[in-house]
Amino acid sequence: MKQKLLQLAHFFGYEVAGYRNFRGKPDPERPWEDDQTFLTAYDAVVNHTLVDRKRLYMLYQLVRQTASMEGSLAECGVYRGGTALLFARLKSKEKRLYLFDTFGGMPETDREKDIHRAGDFSDTSLSHVQNLLHGHGNVVFRPGFFPATASGLENETFSLVHCDMDIYSSVLDFCRFFYPRLARGGVMVFDDYGSLSCPGAKAAVREFCAGQGTFEIYLPTGQAIIWRS
């Protein structure tokens, strides 16, 4: 029963953590507990995202890792703007952040590969996310269907790109567009790779990597990353 409940929580994107006493020292499996910069950012975004704390902490570390690298940031699959706000808070003023989403729900999906259906996650809007990120500079909204909304960015370079698109065709389009435009040492992060509700996301990443002769790194958080060497 316990295992089934844990699996159910993971299916819907939640983390279940037990209590362990480390005599006042940080839990090595919860390194954010003594990272005040992250905790402050987390408090600002937690009510605007479905991404759990472990995955947010991974994104936080990757933003810091790529901070001095050339290239912009991008997120595809913004939903209500929580992770976009995390990026906007952490990035330098000089770095540009591109945000791609329909801001009205999912596009058509592949019934053989995806569980989600067209219109899922429609409880958001462009104006909602714009208001959430108000005051953060160098943020560019690209509303509509990706990859058409990436038109004009063919010569852009990216240091970190975050994919939270859930479905096969969108994730594959993401890989095809961003991978050749990653800076050396740049990273693609896939939020839904290990999610039981997003089998098409994992299938797309694996298909793309097989075609490129590269490999994704599956993280204990359920995310996956691809580095550009």
Descriptions of predicted regions:
Residues 25, 32-50, 60, 69-229:
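S-adenosylmethionine/decaboxylated-SAM
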Residues 16, 67-70:
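Short amphipathic alpha-helical segments enriched in hydrophobics
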Residues 54-58:
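N-terminal pre-P-loop "Q-motif" helix
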Residues 1-29, 47-50:
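Boundary detector for helix-to-coil junctions that initiate low-complexity/charged tails
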